[in-house]
């Protein structure tokens, strides 16, 4: 799977993710964006949830599993609100929002 295929699949399911998980914004960062992915690379996905969304840890893990199943590759899900300043700056510089 390449970056364009990942983007296409996520865009196709964006409304469903918004309804089910209250996803406000979703983007890809990391090795796939930089074109450095290997056969064992996971897909790094940054998500921001709608204000006031009440999601449990199980909901977030469920979203990560659903995205992994959808893309056919392991997904590492990162919530935008939990980014640490140092690493967060680098992620926000390279993220490709859909």
Question: What role is predicted for each listed range?
Answer:
Residues 1-25, 33-39, 50-98:
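Catalytic core of pol beta-like nucleotidyltransferases
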Residues 28:
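Hydrophobic alpha-helical positions that pack around
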Residues 40-45:
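A short, structured beta-strand/loop element
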């Amino acid at each position: 799977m390449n970056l364009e295929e990942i983007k296409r699949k996520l865009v196709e399911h964006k409304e469903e993710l918004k309804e089910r998980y209250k996803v406000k914004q979703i983007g890809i960062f990391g090795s796939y964006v930089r074109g450095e992915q290997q056969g064992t690379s996971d897909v790094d996905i940054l998500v921001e949830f709608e204000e006031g969304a009440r999601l449990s840890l199980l909901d977030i893990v469920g979203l990560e599993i659903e995205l992994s199943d959808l893309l056919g590759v392991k997904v590492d899900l990162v919530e935008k609100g939990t980014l640490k300043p140092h690493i967060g700056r680098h992620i926000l510089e390279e993220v490709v929002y859909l």
